[in-house]
Amino acid sequence: MQKAVVMDEQAIRRALTRIAHEIIERNKGIDGCVLVGIKTRGIYLARRLAERIEQIEGASVPVGELDITLYRDDLTVKTDDHEPLVKGTNVPFPVTERNVILVDDVLFTGRTVRAAMDAVMDLGRPARIQLAVLVDRGHRELPIRADFVGKNVPTSRSELIVVELSEVDGIDQVSIHEK
């Protein structure tokens, strides 16, 4: 049951524009930076951030796609043969000595981000890993903090944050739902 819309299309657009500016400022430009979106919605957010960064800086930043299914400690498994579901990683550039900015839709327990960091480290040794999220809802189980946050949305554990993006869902909005 949906309780409230906490970000509409305009709020998401403004948050991503602000995050793009913060990424550029904190990294003193975009030289050596790469964006890696965490499947599924993190990929679309990473692409949108790359577009905004290019509009601001006049230079493109590479975007990769990361599937962290095999790195999760709470794997999603198929019921028939108990094989982990793998969707595929596509990071077509080296990450070694690069500033890797992981992009995800919601930061909750930190487990997805930990798995994403493991996956990135398997690809090489980045100079630094930063984290950009559209929504930080709290309730961390691991010592992980986002470097760039679109909106902090305090929630109870009985609530869900639902991020809908036009590329997948036909609408841009973030809402809170009861479990």
UniProtKB/Swiss-Prot annotation:
Sequence positions that bind substrate: 40-41, 104-112, 137
InterPro entries referenced in this protein's UniProt entry, alphabetically: PRibTrfase_dom (IPR000836), PRTase-like (IPR029057), PyrR (IPR023050), PyrR_bifunctional (IPR050137)
EC number: 2.4.2.9
Stored CDD domains: PRTases_typeI
Motif (PRPP-binding): 100-112
Signal sequence extent: none
Reaction catalysis annotation: UMP + diphosphate = 5-phospho-alpha-D-ribose 1-diphosphate + uracil
Enzyme class: transferase
GO molecular function: RNA binding; uracil phosphoribosyltransferase activity
Keyword RNA-binding recorded: yes
Gene3D superfamilies xrefs: 3.40.50.2020
UniProt record, GO biological process: DNA-templated transcription termination
Keywords, in A-Z order: Glycosyltransferase, RNA-binding, Transcription, Transcription regulation, Transcription termination, Transferase
PANTHER family (UniProt xref): BIFUNCTIONAL PROTEIN PYRR
Assembly and binders: Homodimer and homohexamer; in equilibrium.
Family the entry assigns: Belongs to the purine/pyrimidine phosphoribosyltransferase family. PyrR subfamily.
NCBIfam families noted in UniProt: PRK05205.1-1, PRK05205.1-3, PRK05205.1-4, PRK05205.1-5
Purpose of the protein: Regulates transcriptional attenuation of the pyrimidine nucleotide (pyr) operon by binding in a uridine-dependent manner to specific sites on pyr mRNA. This disrupts an antiterminator hairpin in the RNA and favors formation of a downstream transcription terminator, leading to a reduced expression of downstream genes.
Protein's name in the database: Bifunctional protein PyrR
Gene that encodes the chain: pyrR
